[in-house]
């Protein structure tokens, strides 16, 4: 009986830790000054749920202490329009690591959310692959591009090197933001 309890406990602990998000290595070519000058991007692909992530746009502006990003969501779920804005403020580099930083996001209602992020790949102009991790639970990886349609060759190269299949991710192509079915 003790063995069954021990194995069950170990299984629960393993599952709990498997769901924890761990930041991946950031892009070596990350340049904060240039990266945070990209004014407007679309989330074109999302690895995990919620699929509504691909219906978002990011508008970033520099501030004295870092940057502020306004994330705008525009989509319809079963005919019901959802339009909201979340303001995220960069609170600095994570452990001094270039390409990794902490952000505090304030949704329209409710408490602020703190995330740690890692820019996995970028050309600092047209695209970025951004990993975001909440303080607990599973994170997500997003493809951000200045072009609403298509896939930048740099994104394709990164996915190929990682052995990832972009066609298996949620995208603006396979998620209809005007009529999302739950």
UniProtKB/Swiss-Prot annotation:
Cellular component annotations (GO), alphabetically ordered: extracellular region
Single Gene Ontology BP annotation: symbiont-mediated perturbation of host defenses
Alphabetical list of InterPro entries matching this protein: Calycin, Triabi/Procalin
GO molecular function, one term: toxin activity
Disulfide bridge partners, by residue number: 21-133, 55-177, 88-105
Keywords, ordered alphabetically: Disulfide bond, Hemostasis impairing toxin, Platelet aggregation inhibiting toxin, Secreted, Signal, Toxin
Entry function: Inhibits platelet aggregation and vasoconstriction through binding to distinct eicosanoids involved in inflammation (acts as a scavenger), and has a role in inhibiting host innate immunity by impairing platelet-assisted formation of neutrophil extracellular traps (NETs). Inhibits platelet aggregation by collagen, and low doses of thromboxane A2 mimetic (TXA2 mimetic), and arachidonic acid (AA) without affecting aggregation induced by ADP, convulxin (GP6 agonist), and PMA. Binds to TXA2, TXB2, prostaglandine H2 mimetic (PGH2 mimetic), PGJ2, and PGF2alpha.
Protein name: Triplatin
Organism: Triatoma infestans (Assassin bug)
